[in-house]
């Protein structure tokens, strides 16, 4: 018997989790590019470490640190545990959270429970999620209802042509997607962010967004997790197309290119952000916030405490980076910038 589409989608979501927990899904040769930059160290800093302020505003919400838990999962039974552990950790630390794709909850009401996080995270910035390939203006009522259902503050639309091409029966028709995105941005009634999934938004894509009033862009560059690798593991049990698994725009390059073309649009830096130093460099290069996903997956399967511990170490390192560079807050950090190594 052929499984119904909703069941097949839930099964694929679970396979994504399993592959990310067990297989080598990071880029193997391509890096984020942040290693080519140095955060200037100031031996005569005039800051008090305990007074450094990491607070910021993003998509209408106040964050205690410029950190989002990146989009990961939804739909599978384990997804609900993961999302609630992530959300409770976000509540404790005052950071934001992106949900995994809500397409599954639009297709299957039962799957909606895996996205319910407001019970443990009443104050957290929660950003919903849908794929650009599936986005249609006719979906706006259902999409708005899905966002209402989870108490989201906004929506992230993920664009992922390479991932979809690697996926069995992926949605590979992106023709007309920009006009559909504009229609949804104009009519949804929620702030809309555009994001990649880890292969990068660069100059050519940013130029297409100049006249599209998105609330933010997550450059989601290459150098961290490769969804082209994940989908090949899911589909073939191996990486059959290694060149495609290594294709993307490094995060540092993506951030620089998009900031140059969209100087006034808030940017999220994600894709291989693994340390507080990575975050400090990204913020100094113009990102408003950073997002972290796969490093938090195993902790989220374990417990809320494991997620809090991981994020607290990350935030503590970021705090020391500001202090050591002589920056009392994020604005001062951006004024200092970074130095490109020879």
Curated annotation (Swiss-Prot):
FMN binds at residues 71-73, 101, 129, 195, 225, 272-274, 293-294. GO terms for cellular component: cytoplasm. Gene3D superfamilies: Aldolase class I. It comes from the Bacteria. Pfam families: FMN_dh. Homooctamer. Dimer of tetramers. This is Isopentenyl-diphosphate delta-isomerase. It comes from Mycolicibacterium gilvum (strain PYR-GCK).
